[in-house]
Design a protein with these regions (language model features):
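Asparagine-centered polar/low-complexity signal
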Residues: 7, 37-39, 97
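Soluble metallo-hydrolase cores and metallopeptidase-like ectodomains found primarily
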Residues: 1-35, 48-51, 59
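Buried hydrophobic packing segments
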Residues: 45-49, 53, 77-80
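His/Asp/Glu-rich mid-to-C-terminal helical/loop segments that flank catalytic regions of hydrolases
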Residues: 51, 62, 173-188
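Short, conserved micro-motifs enriched in small and acidic residues
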Residues: 33-44, 71
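Metal-dependent peptidase/peptidase-like ectodomains
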Residues: 1, 17-18, 31, 58, ...
């Protein structure tokens, strides 16, 4: 329940404390769904990133967030962002969200930071488009097809966007079926 839920946060020992880069995933799942994908995969991704980042000295402070009660209405991330002082909020330069990134029948979605598809939700805060482009460049270099997905408010990037913090991230699909175009690109 949200009342008994907690967030778990960790951060790099190195890096500029005035330039914080955050990566997060939610810890909970719904009873009816496959918790291993939603969101064991996002949690594992952020944890592995933290383990790899421990081997380097990043220029920016890196904060890893494992959110409680996302499935109950983004409770953990909302409380975290709401509790930030203005000064602490200004130090967070970007937030990367990883929710359902290991679907067994995936589509490679990148959060659409600049509303480049021109449909659905508007662009994210300034800086979100740059995050989208970084992921697009990576996928292009790897010759992996990708598609934009709207910031529809259904995951923990929501409170950060509302606070004006640039956001980005990856997603491999949820309850929807693939379109015919997606099935051609990714199989299934």
């Amino acid at each position: 329940t949200p009342a008994s839920s907690v967030n778990v946060l960790a951060e790099s020992t190195h890096g500029d404390v005035n330039n914080v880069v955050m990566a997060g995933a939610h810890l909970d799942s719904v009873e009816e769904g496959p918790g291993i994908n939603d969101n064991g995969t996002g949690t594992a991704t952020v944890l592995e990133t933290a383990l790899q980042m421990a081997k380097v000295k990043p220029r920016n402070k890196v904060r890893f967030a494992f959110w409680g009660a996302e499935e109950s209405g983004l409770v953990g991330s909302t409380r975290y962002v709401a509790a930030l002082s203005d000064a602490e909020g200004e130090k967070i330069k970007l937030y990367l969200n990883f929710d359902m990134v290991g679907s067994p029948n995936p589509v490679y979605f990148i959060y659409d930071g600049d509303n480049s598809d021109g449909v659905g939700q508007p662009a994210g805060p300034e800086g979100s488009a740059r995050l989208e482009k970084i992921f697009e460049t990576f996928y292009t270099m790897k010759r992996l097809p990708f598609k934009g997905t709207d910031f529809d408010g259904r995951s923990d990037y929501g409170p950060f966007i509302r606070a004006g913090i640039p956001a980005g991230g990856l997603f491999t699909g949820a309850e929807g079926r693939k379109t015919a175009e997606e099935a051609v690109l990714w199989g299934g």
